[in-house]
Regions:
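Alpha/propeptide regions of enzymes that mature by internal proteolysis
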Residues: 11-386
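Sec-dependent N-terminal signal peptides of Gram-negative exported proteins
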Residues: 1-11
């Protein structure tokens, strides 16, 4: 598979990144299934109707770090919350912070308003401002009255630190890269691993990055879908678990050459009609899925979760002074909790399973998780289905 910056869009001097995905497999393809609920068609956040994902990968240069020039191992990932009018029909939203070492732009307004009025973007720590500015410009291009005759737009941007592999002083994610990710956002299968915002990320001392998964409830429980997308850059090797198996302890002798404490951003989507309080409760269950993979939210980790419901959209302008919006009973919400925890756990492991080895600045290397050893261990513990 050939990946280019912007996946062949908006790539100025960036060179193609040749990667062989033939040896990488998602967790279910290895015979390991998390929980009892079935995934959606794509086992991705895009199984929630209307949700789209776009990536831009910025990957160029090699060798020693030249500050401000490269090598670049970074990118941007965007999530479109629905396929309609994202400005005028806000999705109900909430957030939860497990450990706040870092930041996520826009969370204050999400907590205050209970909604999201545009895309969600993920990128590297130093470029939250750059990506936010690009998102504002993109939204203005779609809605020219923003900030003039209409309200101003508050972008939502999450970050993780990719400086162990990336020239973090180079600010390599440009406006055209953000625009390309936004314009190229699509439904269907989602690229995972070292792609987009996940290009320079490491997780449990293996190559990490973008991962996704979904769960579909039974018709008796409403038939709703929960989808999760993560950018994982967290954890120590010995903490790592897959379906309860202490994989990290068994693989400690295969340490990667780069170790740096990092973070994780988790995005939870559902089509169940939830109010903001209920979405926040889903976000808290995503933290349980994170914990199942071994994370204890280390002091130096920033663990940020944002969630939204496409099934309860809030009109920006309405002639009605009282709105009647659908809302799921709390008595029916427990299956969504299980779906969220399971999908989060699997999304994180999918990121590890799908990521290739990446050599970054100064030869720093983040090594791909050895899938043959993982399968061997999971079979030993009786966790494989085949």
């Amino acid at each position: 598979m050939t990946l280019t910056s912007a996946d062949a869009q908006g790539a100025d001097a960036d060179q193609p990144v040749e990667t062989d995905k033939s040896t990488r497999r998602r967790l279910r393809d290895l015979g390991v299934e998390i929980g009892s609920l079935a995934p959606g068609k794509f086992n991705a956040i895009t199984d929630v109707p209307g949700v789209k994902v776009g990536h831009t990968t910025v990957f160029h240069g090699e060798g020693d770090l030249v500050r401000g020039e490269g090598p670049a191992r970074t990118g941007v990932t965007v999530i479109m919350p629905h396929s309609g009018d994202i400005w005028r029909d806000k999705v109900t939203a909430a957030s939860f912070v497990v450990n706040g070492n870092g930041g996520m732009l826009g969370l204050d307004w999400i907590r205050e308003s209970g909604g999201i009025e545009g895309p969600i973007a993920l990128t590297n720590t130093h470029q939250v401002g750059d990506v936010a500015s690009a998102m504002v410009r993109w939204m203005i291009s779609k809605y020219p009255d923003i900030g003039v005759d209409d309200e101003t737009y508050v972008p939502v941007v999450g970050e993780c630190d990719d400086s162990a592999l990336n020239d973090a002083q180079g600010f390599h994610v440009k406006q055209q890269h953000v625009f390309a990710a936004l314009d190229g956002a699509a439904s269907g299968a989602v690229a995972e691993g070292a792609v987009g915002a996940g290009t320079g990320m490491s997780c449990y001392d293996w190559k990490g990055g973008i991962g996704t998964s979904s769960r579909v409830l039974s018709e008796d429980d409403g038939g709703y879908t929960v989808g999760v997308l993560v950018n994982c850059n967290h954890g120590d090797r010995d903490q790592m678990r897959i379906d309860g198996v202490p994989v990290g302890v068994h693989l400690e002798q295969d340490m990667a050459t780069v170790h740096r404490e990092g973070s994780i951003v988790i995005v939870v989507a559902t089509d169940a009609p939830l109010n903001a309080r209920q979405v926040e409760r889903l976000c808290k269950r995503a933290a349980m899925g994170l914990a199942r993979t071994g994370s204890v939210a280390n002091t130096s980790s920033g663990d940020f979760i944002v969630g939204f419901s496409t099934g309860r959209q809030i009109p920006r302008a309405s002639e009605d002074t009282v709105l009647s919006l659908p809302e799921l009973s709390d008595n029916a919400i427990d299956p969504l909790y299980a779906a969220t925890a399971d999908a989060t756990e699997e999304a994180i492991i999918n990121a590890l399973c799908m990521a290739d080895t990446v050599v970054g600045r100064d030869g720093n290397t983040s090594t791909a998780l050895p899938l043959d050893r993982v399968v061997e261990l999971m079979r030993t513990y009786g966790r494989t289905k085949n």
